[in-house]
Amino acid sequence: MARQLRAEQTRATIIGAAADLFDRRGYESTTLSEIVAHAGVTKGALYFHFAAKEDLAHAILEIQSRTSRRLAKDLDGRGYSSLEALMRLTFGMARLCVQGPVLRAGLRLATAGVPVRPPLPHPFTE
């Protein structure tokens, strides 16, 4: 049990470090060695959780997508006009982007068109 918790914490640390570097330097300009150093983990730990830099990008995009969907779902059925719901969603995303690099990096990856395999589901389909 403790080993699993430690593995989850290491994975989260790696994702946070990668997101910080992707956000500040860009995906293409960031190397795995820089992520390892920034996270304070070994290359073995990184490769245990992620086979390639693309897998890190995929994990960050999944978190960003899941968070965006949760925000939208929380607004659904509250009686807001379309414009007010969009404004609340935008403010919610902006608030989360200020709090940490993962969502900022996810948005940057999504808008930069970084290809990830397997592709994430399109946000406007079920």
Predicted regions and their residues:
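A short, mixed-charge helix-start or loop-turn motif at secondary-structure junctions
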Residues: 1, 50, 113-117
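Short, solvent-exposed loop/turn segments at secondary-structure boundaries
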Residues: 6, 118-119
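Short linear capping/connector segments at secondary-structure termini
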Residues: 105-113
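Basic, helix-initiating cap at the start of DNA-binding domains
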Residues: 1-25, 29-41, 54-58, 63, ...
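A short His-aromatic
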Residues: 47-50, 54
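Hydrophobic alpha-helical connector segments
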Residues: 59, 70-99, 103, 116, ...
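Key DNA-contact positions within bacterial/archaeal DNA-binding proteins
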Residues: 44
